[in-house]
Amino acid sequence: MKRRGLFLLLCFICFTEIRTGYGQHEVKRFFDLSGPEQFWVFTHLFKAKKGMSVTAEVLRITDSVKRTNSLDQYTSGGKIDAFKHSFWMARLSQSIGESAALSLGKAHEKGNFQDFKKGLKEDGEIPDLPASEMDDFNNKFGAELIKENPDLSKKEVINTLIRSIEEGKLRVLKRSPEGSYLTCKGEPVVNREDQIVWETEKCLVPSNE
């Protein structure tokens, strides 16, 4: 009972900090987050506002890169998805540090698993294990890029990541020329509308395939 009381007190304090330290729009964005992401905010109060700002910037720039057609148009499982996650972790690492950035990435993936269990979609698709493994790989790539090159400018990060994607250093999900998901054997992935599966047959491949 004492532990529960302390936990509720902590939640109240954190909520008060969020209401007083963030604008109305930011508070709304907080409540749009998944449970694991909200918990990350609770445990990183002094970094969360920067994290939200960086995330908004990353989404804007990713949309701009998508409109240039320099990668592809697949916001889930494609090159532009790989760019988004690696760029997100790179910019977060520069802003709030590698450890906090990666822990936010993990919280996001936990949120995706919760969405899977509820049958909810992200970027038009229900999350699954191959997509989560892809995100995790690309998240780590972005964080490692900054660890090895901490002084890269934003433009240099963007160009380096695009080049790395073209060189096959990141990961995407295998597709047919028409855009359908393929297994590692090159066969179409069978989707059953009556069954939602976490461990699908989608195949993780280098980003230049």
What is each stretch, according to the model?
Residues 1-7:
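Bacterial N-terminal signal peptides that target proteins for export
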Residues 3, 20-209:
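Intrinsically disordered, low-complexity, mixed-charge
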Residues 8-17:
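Bacterial N-terminal signal peptides
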